[in-house]
From Swiss-Prot:
Enzyme class label: oxidoreductase
Domain of life: Bacteria
InterPro entries given in the database record: Met_Sox_Rdtase_MsrB, Met_Sox_Rdtase_MsrB_dom, Mss4-like_sf
Species the sequence originates in: Deinococcus radiodurans (strain ATCC 13939 / DSM 20539 / JCM 16871 / CCUG 27074 / LMG 4051 / NBRC 15346 / NCIMB 9279 / VKM B-1422 / R1)
Cellular component terms per the entry's GO annotation: cytoplasm
SUPFAM superfamilies (UniProt xref): Mss4-like
Protein name per UniProt: Peptide methionine sulfoxide reductase MsrB
Length: 157
């Protein structure tokens, strides 16, 4: 995926999304659903690479910023630099939370909370695995995400 491809993204029709996504992916990304804690594919995933929006493929988070928050969902301290996420105030459970959505596809991703590691900015992006697709470091170039290899340069792996 190139930057041009990302900016030219046109969201598929609802019928196309229903066909392409699993039921939980559709529920989470299109209807602000939440997968059950400790059930998603990536909550304890530990491989180097990036996480992209399951709908659009737009890059969202790096494994370098992923940490175990003990909450049962993938947690990150920040998005990939220069990635645009949309934030909205969500009152669905009776109090204000900050919802996080992808910019191009407007996919519901999860929420951001101010209880992350202080030494890494203090934020916890609590993201549903169902909203993500993982691209391993070894496949970044082949899948069109080669520009993100630089995030990992100089890292002993």
């Amino acid at each position: 995926m190139t930057q041009d491809t990302k900016t030219d993204f046109q969201k598929p029709s609802d019928n196309d999304l229903r066909e392409r996504l699993t039921p939980i992916q559709y529920q989470v990304t299109q209807h602000e659903g939440t997968e059950r804690a400790f059930t998603g594919e990536y909550w304890d995933h530990d491989e180097d690479g990036i996480y992209v929006d399951v709908v659009s493929g737009e890059p969202l988070f790096s494994s370098l910023d992923k940490y175990d928050a003990g909450c049962g969902w993938p947690s990150f301290t920040q998005p990939i630099p220069d990635v645009a996420l949309t934030e909205n105030t969500d009152y669905k459970i009776g109090y204000a939370r900050t919802e996080v959505r992808s910019a191009s596809a407007d996919s519901h991703l999860g929420h951001v909370f101010p209880d992350g590691p202080r030494d890494r900015g203090g934020l916890r992006y609590c993201i549903n695995s169902a909203a993500l697709r993982f691209v391993p470091l070894s496949e970044l170039d082949a899948q069109g995400y080669g520009q993100y290899r630089a995030l990992f340069e100089g890292r002993q792996g």
